[in-house]
C-alpha cells in the first residue's frame, strides 16, 4: 500500500499538524484510543483492581532509582559494600535513592500479592484469560529472581549468607546439581565472580524479560478485556454502537480513579522511605549493614519477608515429613484415579504414586524441599485448569469456599511469619501442616471447587452508582 499522509482540517494548530505527521508514521493516537480512551472496562471494578496500575508505577520507580544507583555502585567484592556506603553518605540524595529502591522492592511484592489475590478470588484466570494469568505468574517468577539477584549486591552479611544458602540448594538436584550451583556462583564459594553474575542478571537480563512480560500481560488483557467482581463477560451485552452496556472507557474514568489511589499509595510509600526505611528489619536487615564476612556465619539466616512463605515450606520438608507428604500426595492421586474414566489415567496415577514412593526413599529431604519450594510457585501456572467451578467469582460460590480461601490466606501469612523465625520443633510442625494445606488447596481444587450449591450468576454486572 502506498504511503498516505494524514490530512488535517484547514486552520489546524501546530500541535495538531505535528500529531498528524507522527500518526502517519507511528499510530500513537490509534494506540491511545485502543488501550485507553476506547478501551471499555467493566463499570463495577472495586478497590482490588487498582494494584495492577500501582505495580506499573512501582516498576517505573525501581527502574529509575536503579539507574541512578548503578551510576555509583561497584560490582566488586572488595568495593561493593563501600560503594553502597558511599551512595548513602556522599552522593547527593543517594540515601533517598537507595531507600526508595529498597522500599520499592518490598512494595512491589505487596501490590503484586494483592493483584494475584484479586485474580484468585474473582476467577481472573478462567477462560478466556488463561494467557493473562500465565504471563502474570511468569512476571511473579521473574520478580522473585530479580529480587534474589539484587539481594546480594549490597554485599552485607545477610546478603552474602542468604545467597550462599539459596545457591547451595541447587546442588541437591541429582546429577546436574553440583555443576549448576558451581555455574551460578562462578566459583566454589560466593565471591567476586558471583557478584558480577548476579549484577548482570539484576541490571540487564531479568529487567528486559520483565518489561517484555509486562507488555505481553497488558496486551493480552486488552485483547480479551478485564474481568470484574461478578465474573460476567461485558462483551455479551453491547449497545447499538457495539460498545459494552456495562462498560466505561478506561480513560478518563479509571485513569483518574487510579490517580487518586496512586496519591494515597505514594503517601504511604514516602512515609516508609522517610520515617521507617528499614521497617524494623523486614525491608532492610540489621546484618546487611555489616560487611560480608565469609568466615563468620550469622546466628540466624532468613530471607526477606516476601520469600519467607516459600522458604518456610523448604525448611518444613524434613526426613520425618516425607512419609506424611507421600501419604497426602497418594490420596490426591487416588482421588484423580477414582474420578478418571480412562484406564490409562488410572494407571498413570498409580505409577506416579509408586515413583514418588521410590523417590522419597532414594532422594534426601533437601532435594524434596527444593521441589516443594519450586513447585509451590510453579503450580500457580496451572490454576486455570485446576479450578472446575461452574462460576468464576467468589461472590457466587458456596459459603464454605470462602472459608477455604480464607484459611489459605491465613496459612500463607503463617508460613511467611514462620520463615522469619529461628527453627524450632513446634514451628516445624506448624510449617508442615501449613505446607500440606497450601499444596492441598491447589491439588485438590478439581474436587472441592465443584462441591456445594452455587448462586445464579446475573447476566449483567451488579452496579450501584455513588
Question: In which residue ranges do the predicted regions lie?
Answer:
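Membrane-embedded and interfacial regions of multi-pass energy-transducing membrane proteins
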Residues: 2-107, 111-466
Amino acid at each position: 500500500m502506498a504511503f498516505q499522509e494524514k490530512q488535517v482540517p484547514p486552520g489546524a494548530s501546530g500541535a495538531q499538524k505535528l500529531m498528524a505527521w507522527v500518526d502517519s508514521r507511528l499510530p500513537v493516537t490509534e494506540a491511545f484510543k485502543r488501550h485507553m480512551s476506547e478501551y471499555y472496562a467493566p463499570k463495577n471494578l472495586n478497590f482490588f483492581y487498582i494494584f495492577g496500575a500501582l505495580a506499573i508505577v512501582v516498576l517505573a520507580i525501581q527502574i529509575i532509582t536503579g539507574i541512578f544507583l548503578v551510576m555509583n555502585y561497584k560490582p566488586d567484592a572488595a568495593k561493593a559494600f563501600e560503594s553502597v556506603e558511599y551512595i548513602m553518605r556522599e552522593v547527593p540524595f543517594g540515601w533517598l535513592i537507595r531507600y526508595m529502591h529498597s522500599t520499592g522492592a518490598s512494595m512491589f511484592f505487596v501490590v503484586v500479592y494483592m493483584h494475584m489475590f484479586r485474580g484468585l478470588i474473582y476467577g481472573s484466570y478462567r477462560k478466556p484469560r488463561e494467557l493473562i494469568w500465565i504471563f502474570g505468574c511468569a512476571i511473579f517468577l521473574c520478580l522473585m529472581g530479580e529480587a534474589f539477584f539484587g539481594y546480594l549486591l549490597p554485599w552485607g552479611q545477610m546478603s552474602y549468607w542468604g545467597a550462599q544458602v539459596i545457591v547451595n540448594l541447587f546442588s541437591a538436584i541429582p546429577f546436574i546439581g553440583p555443576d549448576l550451583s558451581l555455574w551460578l556462583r562462578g566459583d566454589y564459594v560466593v565471591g567476586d565472580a558471583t557478584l558480577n553474575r548476579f549484577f548482570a542478571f539484576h541490571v540487564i537480563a531479568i529487567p528486559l524479560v520483565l518489561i517484555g512480560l509486562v507488555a505481553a500481560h497488558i496486551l493480552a488483557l486488552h485483547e480479551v478485556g478485564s474481568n470484574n467482581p461478578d465474573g460476567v463477560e461485558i462483551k455479551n451485552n453491547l449497545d447499538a454502537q457495539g460498545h459494552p452496556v456495562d462498560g466505561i472507557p478506561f480513560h478518563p474514568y479509571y485513569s483518574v480513579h487510579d490517580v487518586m489511589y496512586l496519591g494515597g499509595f505514594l503517601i504511604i510509600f514516602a512515609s516508609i522511605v522517610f520515617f521507617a526505611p528499614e521497617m524494623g528489619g523486614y525491608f532492610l536487615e540489621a546484618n546487611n549493614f555489616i560487611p560480608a564476612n565469609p568466615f563468620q556465619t550469622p546466628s540466624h539466616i532468613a530471607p526477606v519477608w516476601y520469600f519467607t512463605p516459600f522458604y518456610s515450606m523448604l525448611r518444613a520438608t524434613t526426613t520425618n515429613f516425607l512419609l506424611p507428604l507421600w501419604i497426602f500426595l497418594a490420596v490426591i492421586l487416588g482421588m484423580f484415579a477414582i474420578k478418571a474414566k480412562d484406564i490409562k489415567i488410572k494407571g498413570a496415577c498409580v505409577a506416579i504414586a509408586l515413583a514418588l514412593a521410590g523417590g522419597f526413599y532414594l532422594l534426601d529431604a533437601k532435594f524434596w524441599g527444593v521441589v516443594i519450594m519450586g513447585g509451590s510457585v510453579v503450580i500457580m501456572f496451572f490454576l486455570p485448569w485446576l479450578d472446575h467451578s461452574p462460576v468464576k467469582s467468589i461472590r457466587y460460590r458456596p459459603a464454605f469456599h470462602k472459608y477455604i480461601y480464607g484459611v489459605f490466606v491465613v496459612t500463607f501469612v503463617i508460613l511467611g511469619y514462620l520463615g522469619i523465625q529461628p527453627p524450632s520443633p513446634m514451628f516445624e510442625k506448624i510449617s508442615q501442616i501449613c505446607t500440606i494445606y497450601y499444596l492441598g488447596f491447589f491439588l485438590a481444587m478439581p474436587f472441592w471447587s465443584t462441591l456445594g450449591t452455587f448462586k445464579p450468576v446475573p447476566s449483567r454486572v451488579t452496579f450501584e452508582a455513588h
